């Protein structure tokens, strides 16, 4: 950033304080305020205290700058100078002097030479439904050591493969599972035997009228002699249609079985070359380097990026608090690095640095529906780093990643954000991050090509372990199997400690948000076939061992621990670790209705559980940056937490994801999925203009609009270019309405058009701020045309919105136009009346999906029915938040029924916005709370409420109470802001207002005043 933006918060007693001018000074280098002066703004006449750009000479890289500010008040009186604050610049691109290093990408094993086989009676068009059992063998001559053995297999539809009697690889029960080949490293198993027997059970599931079956296998064995031996599926295999005792054991006699039928060589038949084989996963690499520090250290910085994740240690001590670092991006566009102050970790003389690397979304090997196992950037983990050391005499010592580093395979055998991690403690190399460690058996790290993305300093706070929790209870399910209940829904992982367990003991930790009927953990998903949310720890046999994952996180409440010997309870213990991006809580909410306070707590918890460098949809099932979820959740996020840095980063991700023609995907970042898959969808992707507008509203940040203006307008122009009959089209809609497991039944063009309409107006408003008059005019005209087309298509003669696809009245189809200002004046009453009738007809229940839910309560209040909003909000039967609450929820769920897939999904929890804006009554205005409104119009069922938020200008707040004797309200306005205060009363004569409060008008049961800075008390 060439021009850092500076801000300060002002405080003053009394009323009406304001800033009239400021002066900024900046010094470079030195400690505190000791450096040389590089910029003095002089006295600048301005009330602005937010986003003031540095205006001095070009900043130098790797330099600390201190700054301070003084201001003048309304009487022209100058303040004292503020205490100095500082920023530090990072490396320029040409200063790295480092190479990306790591291991070479393995050659994937394909099915070359193998044939699709099945039993007699099958053809390439069809085969009987059911399971068949196959066997074959490979003799090894024993003239050399087995260096590597790999097997790859698939079946139409699923299979389990055994090697010498041990299960080696499987595909879970599914249809069309043949599309994903499964790979396993079986080197250890093959080394133990003179030959190999493969035994496979494969199942053809009932399917379409054309339902072929087939098994495809290739085993490859590499030896020290340079010779390679293979076992391929072909007509030489044996098959039977009856399972027999011991059929998978190597000594089983299969002579009575029948020869298999070779249906087609790989690449032919109905399967073609459509099998995708994920690259076989290699253990997480460890990289190290020893180095000398020639003298005392005055300052040291480590600039580092490890893809997808890294953990670094210097002289045995951990670098930084971050985990799962750096943040996830589209690696073909942007690669983030972090900067660490490591001054205290270094010493004169011998030093060592060690880094371990994880896969994340950069090198994932777990097949999944979003294709994260094969994005365009997919590669093995790699590292770039520069350690720069400053000495008291001004000299510098630098260490960079190059081919002098050493590398080996570490004890983390596999790591996946979806599947979990396998860690073999027997492979721990000892104190490998300390000097003097013998790394003679390690290899030389190889220089790798750089990712395509630009290397940039990470702009947001890295993910951290935020808190730790002891379990609420532990239950024995079966011998060696225990269920741990953490007592809360959370994102993160479990840390396990064991004592005196035998070497080689394998413990499995399976994580889930809910339980199956038998009391075990539910941890399955069709989106990620096979292993899911399961860690495995293999014990080293020490007196005490403690381990926790390093490169994956889970969404869970329950942890099922399996593989424990039947020993005393004190042989093991679990600690829950809460993990997310650290976000300061900037607001509070409280009221006399306990259920409303639960809503607030549950929503805040759910939001935090989904903050991992990007705003995700669910920490358990997907971990994707669904744009629609973020759009619906942003008002709550920005009110509850300090979101500016993290959402600024995600705005960059949105820009990176844009195609040349302007399209945005429904998940961001994206590896290619979400454009044609469930896209385009304006209800989701208009998050881009919405966020930019909210940045100005909440933070006074107009820089975001300037930075993104070209990509923003390109996106909106693309949306306008594809209108049909004047309406926007979409692949999504009011998702997960009651009774529907996905899209709603109505014509989704209604909501698509409404969201595009709002996006055009949001962008036109920002265009006015930036002075982009041509865009303002064009987008306002386009918005009016959309409004006209929407009303012509969907506003019926009976006075409410309906579509030709409606099975019945649709609440969202009427609530969204009311919320977005799309309803013509002469139809507003009838549209609202229809909405009220339907809510009441349903026994005061909502009938909305995620889109309608976000506006329903606020619409009811805006049109004078806070009593109905209260009835809906507090409803305890399906569908409603109270239904979740009474069934044990402590977070927001994805769907209204009890069998909701995710129980940690914030997009149905947006009622929290209504709590802040209507129950407590504090609503953001614009320009970083330069203006805001206080209007508590949802007081039904509530005796008192209060909320406060620390804005960029200071704390704004409201606290009100009502009794039979009257109403009282206290409003707090920070310096530099003006509040419009709506006091419940029929007339001005009923209100006691403080001196200095300017009366504006009386409207709809409220007497309205304007007040500047200060604390103000009103009664009525």
Question: What is the predicted role of each segment?
Answer:
Residues 353, 423-424, 622, 640, ...:
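C-terminal capping/lid segments that line or modulate ligand- or cofactor-binding pockets
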Residues 692, 757-760, 764:
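Non-transmembrane amphipathic alpha-helical segments
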Residues 300-309, 313-315, 493-513, 548-551, ...:
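Alpha-helical support elements that line or immediately flank enzyme active sites
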Residues 170, 317-332, 343, 354, ...:
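Helix-terminus loop motifs that line ligand-binding clefts
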Residues 309, 400-409, 568-602, 608, ...:
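Active-site acid/base region of carbohydrate-active enzymes
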Residues 1-64, 68-621, 629, 645-646, ...:
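Extracellular/oxidizing-compartment recognition motifs
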Residues 373-377, 382-388, 398-436, 457-468, ...:
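Non-catalytic C-terminal accessory modules of carbohydrate-active enzymes
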